[in-house]
Amino acid sequence: MVQDDMSGQDATLLLGLAGLAVEQVELDGEGTRVVHVVTGDEAAAGCPSCGVLSTSVKGHAVTRPRDVPYGPDPVHLVWHKRRWRCMEAACPRGSFTESLPTVPARARVTTRLRTECGAGIATRFSCVKAGAEHYGLSWPIAHAAFVERTWFTLRRF
């Protein structure tokens, strides 16, 4: 089931991931929401090495970063992003793929899921394994999120 009649701007606001714009929401065969997003932040076309904004698209890529559920239901993100050519002659990087603070380069998990997982392990779960299972993450990712959360908390003192 595809829902194209909803306002993309409203859906983007509801998703709440800065820099991503909702293009389409559909239900898969199991009734799970599949949210197709594109990059809505022009700064993502900036080369991570030299900072020059690119205007030359090299290709496209699709990633599926995991995110927090929407209420009790999981949400599957499908990010249709662009691969850019860096046009700066002095830059050693030939090309790069869009990334955002909410979904960093090569990340398979949104920063908000990492943050929620780390906080959950610190406050609600008796061990990292329980938190990892609850959030559907691997133990190393859940542990890293917990360490980040703990480090941030301890640094304040």
Predicted stretch roles:
Residues M1-R93:
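Short, conserved DNA-binding cores of transcription-related domains
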Residues G51, T55, V62-F157:
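Short, positively charged, Gly/Tyr-enriched micro-motifs
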